[in-house]
Amino acid sequence: MLYALLLPHVAAFHAFNLIRYITFRAGGACLTALVVSFLLGPRLIRWLKSLQKQGQPIRADGPERHLIEKKGTPTMGGFLILIALTVSTLLWADLRNGYVWAVLMITIGYGALGFADDFLKLTKRNTKGVPGRIKLVVQAVLGLGAAVWITQLMPGSIADSLAVPVFKHLMIPFGPLFPLVAMFVMMGASNAVNLTDGLDGLAIVPTIIAAGVFTLIAYLVGNRIFSHYLEINFVPGTGELAVFCSALIGAGMGFLWFNAPPAAVFMGDTGSLALGGALGSVAVATKNEIVLAITGGLFVVETVSVIVQVFWYKRTGRRVFLMAPLHHHFEKKGWAEPTVVIRFWIVAMILALLGLATLKIR
């Protein structure tokens, strides 16, 4: 919005020329989202508490202390993230850019699905929410729509291929099936963040870290000079997603202020499904789907732990982990919640560095 409002007046007010620079607008987006979160957070939390007298339903089969320590904490805090992210993006991004709208669509769409899930959990007082099959169908429809939209915006030479990091210009062609691959990336990322969101601050910090990595990736991929120098795919227009990712960082930090242990609010599926969808769609748009799996490796490991646990239990009647997802396994082993969370953050930082390294290793 500011881009469209200020750009025509650059000749009269030279300072407005700053609005041309993605880096300036990215910084503004991050700061704006942070301020919106700080201003809106206390009011939103009070409102959620007034609506949710008993707070988020807690899993009866989870760690015992959760039934005591987390009882009464309101959920749907993802509203705070979505509002701050959307307001900041609309304010600072170039709204003529199709990638921005596609990524916003999947983020808000998955957030709406998460809201429905949280609402059913609260009204029915259980941890089930929207039936799994219905949730997957809605995710698939939204993801496929966004995937088709994004691929239509891309240069035809790379639109239907999956980029392989490290190897120069190695692309795996999928042809007309690529939107299905992109849909899987978005759905997988969304559900992976959702599974990771089980402890105070556990999901939001790795999300912020991944968003930081993709802020840089979006800027480089959308810049002809830098992409040529690094020998990565040049995708015109995706530089604008650096503004979106920066807004996500600011919104995430603002939410963390209230989600730090002991959490005053949980993001719920409203936040976790939306955040994963945001990361997945940005990865698809920047042709860095595999890099997301590396950078967000913590989310991948958490998801795999659930898949392995369910598969092995159905096959043998025994469990591989004391409890899944993996963070609950370590809780059951006696690790304190802050210990689990901080160590997982460290792992997320290491994986983010590995993801960044793929940009230079060729």
UniProtKB/Swiss-Prot annotation:
Gene Ontology CC annotations of this record: plasma membrane
Name of the encoding gene: mraY
Swiss-Prot/TrEMBL GO biological process terms: cell division; cell wall organization; peptidoglycan biosynthetic process; regulation of cell shape
Organism: Acidiphilium cryptum (strain JF-5)
Domain of life: Bacteria
Protein name (record): Phospho-N-acetylmuramoyl-pentapeptide-transferase
A Pfam family reported for this protein in Swiss-Prot or TrEMBL: MraY_sig1
Family stated for the protein in its record: Belongs to the glycosyltransferase 4 family. MraY subfamily.
Family annotation (CDD domains): GT_MraY (cd06852)
This protein's record includes keyword Transmembrane helix: yes
GO molecular function, a single term: UDP-N-acetylmuramoyl-L-alanyl-D-glutamyl-meso-2,6-diaminopimelyl-D-alanyl-D-alanine:undecaprenyl-phosphate transferase activity
